[in-house]
Amino acid sequence: MKTKRTELRIGLPSKGRLFDGSLDFLAKAGLSVYKPNPRQYEATIPALPGVLVLFQRVGDIVVSVEEGSVDFGITGWDTYRERTYNSSRSMPLLKNLGFGSCTLQVIVPESIREVRTLSDLAVYRNNLARPLRAATKFPNLTRRFLDENGLTDTKIIEAEGTLEVAPAIGYADFIIDLVSTGTTLRDNHLRMLEDGEMLRSEACLIANRAALKERPEVMALARTLLEFMEAHLRASTTVSVFANIRGESPETIADLIFEQDVIGGLQGPTISPVINREEGDWFAAHIIVQRKDLYAAIRELRSIGGSGVVVTPVTYIFEEEPVSYKNLLEQLEE
């Protein structure tokens, strides 16, 4: 009789950009991974006692979560979509972790200058009087995308390793591959089609659906992970701003702040009196603003008499309940 597993397991990428990105992301979310031996494929998260970290290839993480040998995993959204085609044994908990960004693109040689769009590619096929050949690591996503765009007779060549050389050696007419900066494409005389984007991808958090339903400890860990990850992601785009403002009362300061476009804060400013040696009433205002709006916020504070502006990073912003956890509960009821 097989012993029921009680250990909680999280799969993380074993190498590459997603390996570094996952460790950095978890550390910033307060869930640092402890891996004393770099050669080992196991680790722990001190903040989560009883949780075992397993380092795997991104594709194997999806398979392990699907099969239930691992409860949670961080992998690429592109890999997850490809490996779970027509499957519902796993589910995404957070689709955008903020790192590992790339797009899945239809890519053609620069030498076929007349091909700029998918429609052009269909005309090119007709002129060749034969089906086109597409090399890719994503046969399921590729098949569906090409079928939806009138290229149903394209021969899909499933390949591993470097795809950029395939058109040059006559192995394929075009490729479908992940693109982050586009530098590799230019170096190999390739370019993306204008309408050839198949998928936008980032690192994502996934979980085994049955484990969430049947094991309370897995559901409890899901909530903890989502609490810290979502709070970190929400905070990562914001800064905390303090400023001293002269005024008659907290209410008058608040009125001045609410007349501005940027500095209203999350629910509103926190305003408190400043004990100072100078004459007149001073108040300290504390607000949270989007990082991209920081300079606009400073200008607005100055316009209402603000001075001594101090800006600090925000580590977490916790809401009453994580939105992603509410979504998880709803999905499990479906």
Regions found by a protein language model. Name each.
Residues D60:
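Acidic/His-rich segments in extracytoplasmic proteins that coordinate ligands and/or metal ions
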Residues V106:
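Periplasmic solute-binding protein
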Residues G68-S69, W77:
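Aromatic- and charge-enriched surface segment that lines or borders ligand/interaction sites
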Residues M1-F55, I74-T103, I112-S119, Y124-E334:
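Small-molecule-sensing regulatory modules
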